[in-house]
Amino acid sequence: ALEDANKAEIIFNGNPVKNDTIGNFVDISIFKVKLPDIVKGTNILLVTYPFGESANLESMYILGEFGVKVMGRDASITALPEKLYFGDIVNQGLPFFGGNITYKIPVTVKNNHLTVCASFYRGALITASLDKKEPVKIIYPPYKAEIEAENGEHILELKLYTNRFNSFGSVHLVDKMEHWQGPDSWRSEGNRWSYEYIFKRTGILKTPEISC
């Protein structure tokens, strides 16, 4: 996915790639272009743009169902994690992930009522739903959802709405306490710049408390 796809010359593993677009990614200015399959080992993606004083280069994104392993400044594609645990998804193979995550939890209801408390998470909000019914928002203290349900076996789904920082943010800016984000956040230099990735924690970081 890249901006100005129609101006780009794309070569993947030595083979020219048509820059025909197949939709957008997140923003109407970012276009998706289909690449050939990635092969095991080293892959080389070469993108050539016309560039001058008035030109700007923006980030590009490799999209697909895979995981990513980051070691310092190096990142490599891995298999998609089979399951996620409560905790930071950055350390579970999804460091750049900026979509939503649904945690599915089997529960047994005994008193026609279920309470779930998810008090420690990093994201915009959580919704809780039982058997895909109407979701209940978890966003303000005490971070609880109350759900009426028939006794028996159910699937509780906790959907975390993450943010786009680890996908689009200034992931090389050392100053993690910088709360204001603007153009200069992506132009850090000197001791404010890091070749290693500086991610923000993302996920439901503590096992939710469930009573039913």
Language-model features and meaning:
Residues 21-25, 134-139:
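Short beta-strand segments within Ig-like beta-sandwich modules, predominantly Fibronectin type-III
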Residues 2-4, 22-28, 33-106, 118-120, ...:
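An acidic-aromatic loop/edge-strand motif
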Residues 1-14, 45, 107-132, 137-138, ...:
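Aromatic-lined ligand-binding clefts that engage carbohydrates, nucleic acids, or primary amines
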Residues 142-146:
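Short, surface-exposed beta-strand/beta-hairpin micro-motifs centered on an aromatic residue
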Residues 15, 67, 133-134, 209:
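Residue-level signal for well-ordered, solvent-exposed loop/turn and beta-edge residues enriched
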